[in-house]
Amino acid sequence: MLADLTVKDFLDKVACSDPVPGGGSIAALDGALASALSTMVARLTVGKKGYEASEEVMQHAQTITLRLLDEIIALIDKDSAAYNEVFACFKLPKTTDEEKTARSAAIQEATKQAALVPLEVARKALDMMSVIADVARLGNRNAVTDACVAMMSARSAVLGALLNVRINLGSLKDRDFVLQLQTEADAIEQTACQREKELLDAVNQDLRV
């Protein structure tokens, strides 16, 4: 399991010549880092003097970010597995017409799954961004820049994951499926970039001296 590796071992694995783990798994890792960091900010707020009014929001934020953390960690490996399945389908026999038909169908189905996994990463990272915005707004002011880094990591997760969605859509024949995912991907990207901009603009303005 990729998620069980040390940071050094994971990075060494990414840096090798194998195509997995690649950008999709890294996008999921970005999302996991965003979740972990936003959880830290919430925990630095709970129980602190002056933040009593934020207690309930921070407790709820922790519940959501920890759930998303577990879900996105699972997607780190799931993305690599989806790629491996597509690769395996290309190795299927293609001597007879029947084999060619079966191979083509298998490739199409595996490619759909390879598009759906990063889409799920993008969805979860986008969900996280709304929580991060609350954590940044109401959380410990000494950790507001940590919340911003969490937001940027979540945005990176979204954009990286959506690139992997789009590259897989390019080889699919099911145009209804392609249009559906393209439409959702475009909407997610627009919302993610807007959420990041709103937070960074506000925090950078506050930090100016």
Spans of model-derived segments:
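Short, hydrophobic/aliphatic alpha-helical segments
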Residues: L2-P21
